[in-house]
Amino acid sequence: MIFIMKLKNLLPIFCFFLVSFSISSAQKCGKTGLFKPNDKYDINRHLLLSSLASNVSARGGFYNASIGQGPDRLYASGTCIQGSEPELCSACIDSAFIRVIKKCHNQTEALDWSSFNEEYPCMIRYSNRSFFGLLEMTPFFKNYNATDFQVNLTEFYQKWEALMLGVIADAISSPNPKFYGAGTGKIGIQTVYAFVLCSKDISPWNCSRCLRGNVDNYKLSCSGKPRGHSFSPSCYMRWDLYQFYGFIEYRASPTLPREKGRISELSDDGGKISTRNILGITVALAFFITVLLVLGYALSRRRKAYQEFATENDITTSGSLQFDFKAIEAATNNFQKSNKLGHGGFGEVFKGTFPNGTEVAVKRLSKISGQGEEEFKNEVLLVAKLQHRNLVRLLGFSVEGEEKILVYEYMPNKSLDYFLFDHRRRGQLDWRTRYNIIRGVTRGILYLHQDSRLTIIHRDLKAGNILLDVDMNPKIADFGVARNFRVDQTEATTGRVVGTFGYMPPEYVANGQFSMKSDVYSFGVLILEIIVGKKSSSFHEIDGSVGNLVTYVWRLWNNESFLELVDPAMGESYDKDEVIRCIHISLLCVQENPADRPTMSTVFQMLTNTFLTLPVPQLPGFVFRVRSEPNPLAERLEPGPSTTMSFACSIDDASITSVDLR
């Protein structure tokens, strides 16, 4: 009976731990006005907010911008922790974008202070009025635990406020304010953790004013509640009894007063709790926490498995904008041929212009393509989760009957092959531009293989899938045949080979095996094409043998006459050492044995560290020899007369839809 009474006394504490898992985000939709779905303001909102993740993470944790004119003009900003991992920042901004679009679906103003997976805080905000650089302390929002805190509140809040002020001072300390702070302190038997964050476009003084206002408002309205957070448009504050953001260093606050004695913890009747009772409470509480954690873990695993099963193939949960098909038709002038930019194995690409003047690239999947639906779903689900300056950005999609549309950011300079393989235009690609393209593509592939939340094998790297922005910066595109690897997965095998001839490694063509090293091989071929200025397939009969670009370069390398490779269109204005080093790296990438090929991380080091000694390249894949018998697989790959070679593939680099390996 006594034990049951003690358990009764523990229920408020037990409820506290239950409630403590609830704080993760807070979205506030403005009441200043509404807009109609798919009008100019709605389009501007999606276009600007969908680009926040990449821009905020690429600019050190803060970015603001506006888009549109007159009443359709929209202002937006994003805030992360300065100096934090770009991938965490990007993921948090992306999740906030998805939430605010869903909850504030037609409000002209909204903000979201949130955390990604309870591990990383960030903020996004948009409005139809300019708020850049303005201190805005209202409206004030709060969230707190409903359980009463059983402590001496006067003594507790004296030290709690000292901790908060110390954290605020850390956030605005000169000479380089961080605009965020984190601290911890011991108050009685409790360890308290605190965190603050300000929008970086306000001054340090205004940051302090905003946070102090939050502290005062919280004390007035949430006194006696253990844990909580409060925020206004310009700043955010959170405190709790556990280390809620695991990656942040919580410094012991220098302003926290030294304790003169223990804070008296009161029982329900107002008396002191004895040592024996404290021990009993501690044991019982430990038991409840253990049970809670076990149950919580089991339930979370079950819920996560169900959610993954339910959403794995649902593109509506991808976070991308679903455009109205009629808006796409209007933007492309009903897919008029004059707006056509090109075509691929699964459809055509058109230029589109929205009413606000925003230009986009619209990929219309072929209705008769056997793999079109799979390609479409794969591209939406993968690319929506990727954010990098060297990857083309997916703005959204549209589904209308048999029509399947992908909407991308528009690249005014089209693709690399548009310049590289045209005898007139390739003169515009000097060596510095080509070298920057090589380095940019390296960064993009490295992100796919190593630095993103997913491990992505592209499987179709080629000049036609490298788009160029207005400054000729490269962006990798076309993820229709890409595959996502598990964390512990290094390779996979497929019975259907997809990709482009001339770029596919021998183990993939012959056996359907692909891995990160498959992309490395394709990248090696791409480097050679950039240097030579010709397609890999343009090198045929060489000294009585069937050849390709890899064969040709290997022979010149062995003869030490590799500078004959250099595209004459570049003239003499190129760095010979850089060119030779790039040729050397490319030959390392196209080695026959995948284990001999470097990783993209190593390739990046080879390109950026000229003092790094490069190993001697071994025999590359696809060193062709004359063979009298026809190759049946090659006949299936490329219609027409069969091509004789030592591996089952065509020397043409035409794109293919699929090949069934038997």
UniProtKB/Swiss-Prot annotation:
Organism of derivation: Arabidopsis thaliana (Mouse-ear cress)
Gene: CRK16
Membrane topology note: Single-pass membrane protein
One GO term describing the cellular component: membrane
Lineage start: Eukaryota, Viridiplantae, Streptophyta, Embryophyta, Tracheophyta
Transmembrane feature ranges: 278-298
Descriptive protein name: Putative cysteine-rich receptor-like protein kinase 16
All copies of domain Protein kinase, residue ranges: 335-612
SUPFAM superfamilies reported in the protein's UniProt record: Protein kinase-like (PK-like)
First-tier enzyme category under EC: transferase
Residues bearing glycans: N55, N64, N106, N128, N145, N152, N206
